[in-house]
Amino acid sequence: MLFRNWLFLIAGLLTLAGYWGPWMDHRAAGLVITGLDLGELVKFLPTVRSGAVTVWREGFYWPLVAVSLGQSLVAFRIPFRYPWLGRAAMLAVAVVAALNLLPPAWTPARMMTPEFYLQSGGIALCLAAVAVSPVLALLPHRITAATITLLCGLAIWFPVRDFLRVLPDIAALYNHSGRLGWGLFVMAGGLILFVRMGWTGLDGKERKVRG
């Protein structure tokens, strides 16, 4: 098994590490803001509540959706011949990413309220993809690569755009300069690697199989 074959899993892990890492750094660990925090935090910002700044709250969860669906799309693709342990690891990453869509202190009743419809739908979609991942492996290369590209593109665009929109307000709230943390850049790097592998990795492997 070539190291290159594991770059899909590595890309997913890098994306999650960046997403869970600091997006706005602070000397006090309790004031560090991660990508995962933002989906809840923006609800309480005065400028967002007043409508002065417009953000799509659920957009901050797109990296989780991209990682989860991406791992499910690739885990059983025949050209890579992943061992069962490797497939299990990729699907475990997919499940962990999906479950991180749950809000803090969630309950089944709370997840059925309009505020969390999209998150509930995202979890259901991601877990369904895990369940049918052997079938997803039969999709043509170009459809898989295009889907990965779309997912990762949205996972960069929505969170980064809206984070930069609210960054001045968060900095004012925390009374410091709003220094960007490493998490944002690592997440973007992981998603870019995923896209690159989606086209070059899948295409090269499947050409060899056809040959």
Predicted features along the sequence, with ranges:
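Compact integral membrane and secretory-pathway proteins
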Residues: 1-211
